[in-house]
Every structure is written in C-alpha cells, then in structure tokens.
C-alpha cells in the first residue's frame, strides 16, 4: 500500500553501500531540509487503493452492514505494548456519546486486541463488526484502506489507523491524550500533516468521556452540514 506513494522502497534489512549521495537519520530529515510546521507538505491523498479492492469492499459492506445514512468507523485501542499506550488508548465505553448522533451507523475497525470490548458495549446504538481476517490475504492495511473509502467519518485513538486515514484524506476525528506525541503539536485542533483531520484534546489525564462529547458535537455539526 505505502509503495504507491513513493518512487522506491529499500527495506532496512538491505545493506546499501553505494548508489546514494547522502545519508541522514530519519528523525533529522525535516531539520536538514528546513521544513517547519507552516510548510509541511499536505497534498493528500498520497497513497492509492486499487480500484478493484475498493469495489470489492463496497459489495462486501453492502452484504455485511444494513443500509445507513452515515457510517462512522471506530478505533480505540492501539498497540498495548507501546510505552505510552495508557495515555493514548481509551475504553470503547468512552465513545458512548456518539450514540446521540442521528442516522449514523457505528462500525468497529478494531482488529485483534481491544476488539473483545465490543462484546461488553452498552451503548444505545449497536456497533457492527467486520471479519477479523481483514488484511491477511491482501497485505497489511490494504483491506482496511479500501474499507475507509466507504465510511463517512473515522473516530480514532492515536494509532496507525489515524495516519492511514489522514494519508487517504478521509474525514477523521483524532482523540488525543493530555500529553500527545510531538507530531500533533499543542493548542490547535488541526494538523499540518493531514488537512482532513480534526484533533480533539484531552483536558485531564485519564478522562476520555469529555473528549468523546466534544468529538460528538463536532460530528453533529459536520453531519448536519451534509443533510
């Protein structure tokens, strides 16, 4: 999937001793190139999904999910082994305010760890689940990327799917912890990386419901605009 947005990809396991002019640590690239927040390239989408896969998932979702006016994809759990996971992932129950939205269908994009929380969901709207073998045959993120194409909005924690949605220019609400990763900066609700993304920030460590309430209010206004 990510090869569609670059001219070439060299795996880190390859030993490359010639054929390049410069070498630079990835974390230093922005500084070396003189890139700052105001000039970060944000021409999205910069990765492409095969049309046949997009069409396949349009048909599949039509069979798996009932008709809906608006579909909202949900992700709440990142990698539990991440050193900051306790500050960026949140319980699924925190998203209960989303049930206040009219004419929406909630769809879980949570696969593997964290997906078991759907069984304990007590919200007034059901959460529809997708097959757990997604991406296993088509390649990492391929099916997921095609599915995002058929959702109106994505609500997600700070995990890999947030970056996938942003790179695909999908409308996204990112729920951030009190002290987020450096790339999300501070004191702003947008991001120079992904122009279709809205940032909703936690005001107090560990308190996620108010973040979901703010996300819900934002979505209500955007969905109202599309009526």
What are these regions (language model features)?
Residues 2-227:
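Catalytic machinery of carbohydrate-active enzymes
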């Amino acid at each position: 999937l990510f090869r569609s947005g670059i001219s070439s990809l060299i795996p880190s396991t390859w030993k490359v001793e010639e054929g390049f002019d410069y070498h630079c640590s990835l974390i230093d690239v922005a500084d070396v190139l003189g890139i700052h927040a105001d000039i970060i390239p944000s021409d999205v989408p910069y990765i492409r999904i095969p049309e046949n896969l997009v069409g396949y998932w349009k048909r599949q979702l039509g069979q798996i999910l009932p008709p809906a006016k608006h579909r909202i994809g949900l992700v709440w759990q990142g990698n539990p082994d991440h050193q900051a996971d306790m500050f960026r992932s949140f319980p699924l129950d925190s998203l209960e305010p989303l049930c206040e939205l009219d004419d929406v269908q909630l769809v879980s994009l949570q696969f593997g760890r964290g997906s078991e929380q759907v069984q304990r969901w007590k919200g007034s709207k059901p959460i529809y689940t997708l097959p757990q073998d997604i991406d296993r045959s088509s390649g990492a993120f391929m099916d997921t990327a095609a599915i995002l194409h058929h959702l109106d909005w994505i609500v997600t924690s700070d995990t890999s799917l947030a970056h996938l949605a942003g790179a695909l220019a999908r409308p996204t609400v990112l729920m951030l912890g009190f002290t987020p990763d450096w790339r999300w900066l501070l004191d702003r609700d947008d991001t120079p990386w992904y122009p279709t993304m809205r940032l909703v920030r936690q005001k107090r460590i560990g308190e996620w419901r108010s973040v979901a309430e703010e996300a819900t209010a934002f979505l209500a206004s955007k969905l109202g605009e599309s009526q």
